[in-house]
């Protein structure tokens, strides 16, 4: 066991991401991020997302309260919807805490009225 005297905020250790394109129109895209937290006392505290050009940058932050905790990895899975509405057709990159994957939008993702 380790004892922490201050809260700890850090990035989640993401091991893999999976991109899921839902069969709908407009298309919906989700990223499933999987990894391990350093202990069961650490939790996902915040998921931030921004897009620069054709790249989605997603940051998963963790929070750990001060105190004792057993030192054993705690797996996590976080499902993150991407804001892909109104995007033109093309290839896009997703980066979640440094782990990257790509997906293709076959057509412009705009609902015509």
Regions found by a protein language model. Give the residues of each.
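Exposed, flexible binding/inhibitory loops of compact, secreted disulfide-stabilized domains
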Residues: 1-113
């Amino acid at each position: 066991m380790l004892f922490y005297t201050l809260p700890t905020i850090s990035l989640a250790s993401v091991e893999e991401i999976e991109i899921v394109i839902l069969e709908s129109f407009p298309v919906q895209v989700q990223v499933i991020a999987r990894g391990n937290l350093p202990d069961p006392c650490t939790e996902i505290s915040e998921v931030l997302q921004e897009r620069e050009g054709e790249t989605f940058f997603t940051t998963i932050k963790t929070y750990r309260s001060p105190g004792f905790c057993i030192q054993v990895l705690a797996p996590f899975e976080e499902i993150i919807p991407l804001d892909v509405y109104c995007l033109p057709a093309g290839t896009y990159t997703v980066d979640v805490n440094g782990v990257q994957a790509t997906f293709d939008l076959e057509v412009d993702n705009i609902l015509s009225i």
